[in-house]
C-alpha cells in the first residue's frame, strides 16, 4: 500500500502487515488533480488546485495525529492497469481500515446553513458520485469538511440526515454488516449515483458486495454490471437481485429491436431505484419437501440457471415468484416478476412488464400455485400427463440466446381429490395429485392440512400446495 507522509508530502510504500495507522481523504475529482507521476517526480506546474488539496489533506490528517494519508489521486499509479485493478478491488478494505476518513465537500461553504434537508450540505455533489458510496459506508467514522477545510460535522452526528439524503438505513451507516441488507437494497443505494467512466458504476460496488473481479474498461456499463451480478450470484442466493424495474415506455415483445433488452438481469443500478425497501424473505416460499430440489444458480455458455416457483397466467405468461418481499411483509407477500413464452413450440421465455413487479399475498400464492399448470375449469377432469415434459425458457437479453427450462414436475404423490372454492375436481391420474393449502393459526406456530388421504407430508407453515419449477437460464 502506498501512503503519503503528512510531514514531507512524499510517498512511502508498505506491505499489508506493516501498514502504519493512516487517515484517508474522500473527495470528488476536478480538473488539475495531482497524480502519482506528479508527486513522484515533483511536478506541480498547472496543478496548483491539486496540490492545495494534497497540502490541506496532509495538514488535517497531521492535526488529527496521523503521520500518513491515503489520497487516491496520488497513491495509485493509474497508468499501471494491474495496480489500478488491485487498488479498486482493495479500496473498500482500505477505507474500512483507515483510522479516520475526511470527506472534503468542495461545494459546501463554511458559512452555509446548518445541515438540513435543503441545505448546501444535502445538495453536495459528493452524495451523488458512485465511488463515494463505499467511502461513506466503509469507514467507522467520516468527518465532513467545508470548502475552506473547516469541520462541518461527522457521519455519526448527521446520521439521520444522511439516511434521508442517500436512502441508506441508519444502521448500515453506523456499521451494521452490509450482508444484512438485501442485494436489491444495496443496489438501490447506487441507483441515482453517477461515475465519469461508464463501467465504474459497477466497479465502485465491488466492496459493497465483497466481490473481486477484473476490470475491463470498454465493456460499457451493461457489460460491467452484468458481470457484477453474475459474481454476486456465485456467492448469494438472494433472489431480490431480480426485483428491479426498468424506467421508460413499455416495449412490445413483438418489437424485434427490443428483444435484447428483455433480460432477467438489470443493465444498471438505476433499475433498482424503487427496490430500496425489498428484503430477502427469511423462510423460502418453496416448502420444505421441495428445498432439496432447488438448484443453485449456475452459469454456462447459454446463460444462468436457477429454480423458481411459478404461477401460470394467460397469454403464455407466467409469474415467477421470488423469495423476497417488502420490508415488514415477509410473512404476508412475495415479489413476482412477469415472464412470457415467445417461442413457437413452447417454453422459451423473456422478462416482460419490466416497468413493474407484482406483490402477491401468500394466501394467493398458495392457491394460485396449486392450479398453476392444471388449468381445470368448470370442474372438468384434467389429465396432468401433458405437464410432465420439459420446456425451454429463453432470455433473449443475452448476447447470444440465453435459454431457460420450465419444468412442472416433482408433484406430490397422493390419492383422493381436492377442493377449490367448494368444488370437487376428480383426478384420473392419481400419480400427480396435490395437497390443499394449509391453514395457519394466528400464532403461525401450527398448520393443518385440509385434505384427507395424503401421504403424510410433514406439516409446515407457508406450504406450497403444488409446484411448477421455472429453471431459468437468463443473462443480462
Regions found by a protein language model. Give the residues of each.
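Acidic beta-strand-to-loop metal/phosphate-binding motif
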Residues: 74, 104-106
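Active-/binding-site microenvironments in catalytic and ligand-binding cores
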Residues: 24
Amino acid at each position: 500500500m502506498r501512503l503519503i507522509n503528512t510531514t514531507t508530502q512524499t510517498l512511502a510504500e508498505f506491505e499489508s502487515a506493516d501498514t502504519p495507522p493512516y487517515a484517508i481523504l474522500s473527495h470528488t475529482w476536478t480538473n488539475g488533480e495531482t497524480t502519482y507521476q506528479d508527486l513522484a517526480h515533483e511536478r506541480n506546474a498547472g496543478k496548483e488546485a491539486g496540490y492545495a488539496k494534497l497540502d490541506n489533506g496532509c495538514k488535517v490528517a497531521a492535526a488529527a495525529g496521523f503521520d500518513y494519508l491515503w489520497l487516491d489521486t496520488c497513491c495509485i499509479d493509474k497508468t499501471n492497469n494491474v495496480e489500478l485493478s488491485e487498488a479498486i478491488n482493495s479500496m473498500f478494505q482500505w477505507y474500512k481500515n483507515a483510522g479516520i476518513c475526511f470527506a472534503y465537500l468542495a461545494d459546501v461553504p463554511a458559512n452555509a446553513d446548518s445541515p438540513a434537508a435543503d441545505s448546501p450540505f444535502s445538495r453536495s455533489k459528493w452524495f451523488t458520485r458512485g465511488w463515494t458510496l463505499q467511502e461513506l459506508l466503509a469507514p467507522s467514522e467520516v468527518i465532513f469538511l467545508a470548502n475552506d477545510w473547516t469541520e462541518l460535522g461527522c457521519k455519526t452526528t448527521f446520521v439521520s440526515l444522511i439516511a434521508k439524503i442517500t436512502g441508506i438505513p441508519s444502521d448500515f451507516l453506523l456499521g451494521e454488516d452490509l450482508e444484512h441488507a438485501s442485494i436489491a437494497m444495496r443496489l438501490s443505494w447506487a441507483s441515482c449515483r453517477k461515475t465519469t467512466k461508464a463501467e465504474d458504476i459497477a466497479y465502485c460496488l465491488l466492496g459493497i458486495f465483497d466481490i473481486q473481479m477484473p476490470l475491463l474498461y470498454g465493456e460499457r456499463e451493461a457489460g460491467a454490471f452484468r458481470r457484477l451480478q453474475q459474481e454476486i450470484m456465485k456467492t448469494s442466493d438472494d433472489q431480490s437481485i431480480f426485483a428491479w424495474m426498468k424506467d421508460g415506455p413499455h416495449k412490445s415483445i413483438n418489437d424485434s429491436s427490443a428483444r435484447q433488452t428483455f433480460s432477467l438481469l438489470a443493465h444498471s443500478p438505476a433499475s433498482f431505484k424503487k427496490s430500496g425497501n425489498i428484503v430477502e424473505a427469511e423462510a423460502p416460499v418453496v416448502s420444505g419437501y421441495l428445498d432439496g430440489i432447488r438448484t443453485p444458480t449456475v452459469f454456462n455458455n447459454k446463460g444462468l440457471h436457477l429454480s423458481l416457483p411459478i404461477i401460470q397466467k394467460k397469454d403464455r405468461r407466467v409469474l415467477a415468484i421470488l423469495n423476497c418481499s417488502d420490508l415488514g411483509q415477509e410473512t404476508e407477500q412475495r415479489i413476482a416478476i412477469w415472464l412470457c413464452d415467445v417461442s413457437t413450440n413452447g417454453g422459451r421465455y423473456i422478462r416482460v412488464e419490466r416497468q413493474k413487479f407484482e406483490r402477491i399475498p401468500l394466501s394467493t400464492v398458495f392457491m394460485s400455485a396449486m392450479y398453476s399448470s392444471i388449468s381445470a375449469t368448470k370442474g372438468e377432469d384434467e389429465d396432468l400427463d401433458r405437464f410432465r415434459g420439459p420446456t425451454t425458457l429463453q432470455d433473449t437479453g443475452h448476447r447470444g440466446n440465453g435459454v431457460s427450462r420450465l419444468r412442472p414436475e416433482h408433484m406430490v404423490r397422493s390419492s383422493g381429490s381436492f377442493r377449490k372454492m367448494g368444488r370437487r375436481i376428480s383426478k384420473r391420474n392419481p400419480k400427480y395429485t396435490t395437497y390443499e393449502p394449509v391453514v395457519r393459526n394466528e400464532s403461525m406456530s401450527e398448520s393443518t392440512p385440509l385434505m384427507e388421504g395424503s401421504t403424510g407430508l410433514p406439516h409446515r407453515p407457508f406450504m406450497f400446495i403444488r409446484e411448477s419449477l421455472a429453471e431459468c437460464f437468463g443473462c443480462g
